[in-house]
C-alpha cells in the first residue's frame, strides 16, 4: 500500500486463489486506511498484514511494528518466532518437561519483542489515529486543488478506498518543464522545502543486481523513479506551511 493508498486487494486475492500463493500486505504506510469500507489490516484478502511503527510513520513506537492475521496457526508461529523460537507450551515440545523451569527451542527465531514502554507509546497514539489520518487527507485534498494546472501529476485514490496518506508524491511531467528531475529536487531543497524521493527501485540495488536483475527490467518502477518527488505532509502541518511549499514549487517549475 505505497504512500498509504490501498491496493486493489480483491484483484490480488483473486490471483492468489488462481495461482495458489500466499498474500502478505505491506501496510507500513497504510495504518488508518480503508479498503471497501474495512480497515487495512483486517486480512479479508490476505494471510498476513504488517505495519511499521518507525519514527517517521503516522503512529510510532520509536521502532518496531505489528503483524495481524486471521489464522490461529500463523499467529502461533509468529508468537514463537518473535521470541527466539522458544516455548514453554508442552504441546509444542518434543520431550517431557524436566520441571517448572523447562522450555525448548523448537524453531530458529529471533528477539522481535517490542518493549512495554514502546507499546505504551503506540497505544497512547491509537486514540488519535483517526484525527491524524483525517488531517493528512484534508491536507492532501488541498494539495490536489492548489497544484492543479502545474506540469505534474498528483496522487490518485482508487475507488472504494481511503488512503492513510503517509506520503504525498508528485510526478513531474518532464517533457513539459525546462529543468531536470534532479535540478527540480535540488532547487526545492535549496529553497528550504524538505522534499525526498520514495523510493529507489529495489531491483537496482547492488544486492539484487547480484541476483541477475538489471536497471532496464521494470519499466514502470524506473519511470516512477525518474519523475517522482515526495513533498512535505504531516498532520501538524499548517496551511501557511503548505502555502509556502506550493509557492516554491510554482516558482521552480513555472
Model-derived features: where do they sit?
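Active-site phosphate-binding strand-loop segment of PLP-dependent enzymes
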Residues: 1-61, 66-74, 230, 234
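PLP-dependent aminotransferase class I/II
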Residues: 5-12, 18, 34, 72-254
